[in-house]
């Protein structure tokens, strides 16, 4: 399939585009920053009755994931090209996501770039509003310092309770990045959090 055909299967969201319509009575998961989509595809294959949103800002990555889905006959993934802050802040309906995976985002290790890190108190407030009651936030990173800081920020938010058992079903599913990292003998650190406090009514 050519690029035009692939692009017709990708939903592009900007501040000029309508909000996402998430179906009711469906278990909905989101892979935020899905990359080439190895994790996303495996998750969708494991749970064919769930709706899986694959989100990335890079069109080339989404095209590769689209090809992968066509090759394996995966039909329960929706591809979204969107910036994470806009998606979590505006486009997603409140109380619509059962589980969100944020796996190995850019750790921005240089001091002058750390303000670009996605995990922050404001991001967590927005995420809390988009998760369903008792919804799950799954985070991972290869950067030990970022991991420790992220855990601290999430704990201090008071919005989530840690429960790593909520990702026991996906411990053997890896992103393309984690697979390469593990092959070098290096670890990726995971944690899972349940929404324990509702900031807004939905």
Where do the protein language model's features map onto the residues?
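Conserved SAM-binding loop
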Residues: 65
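Conserved SAM/SAH-binding beta-strand->alpha-helix loop
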Residues: 58
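Class I S-adenosyl-L-methionine
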Residues: 152, 157-202
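Class I SAM-dependent methyltransferase "Motif I" SAM/SAH-binding loop
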Residues: 33-35
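Conserved beta-strand signature within the Rossmann-like core of class I S-adenosyl-L-methionine
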Residues: 134-141
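S-adenosyl-L-methionine
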Residues: 1-28, 38-45, 69-94
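A short glycine-rich, Lys/Arg-flanked "PGG" loop and its adjoining helix->strand segment in the class I
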Residues: 119-133
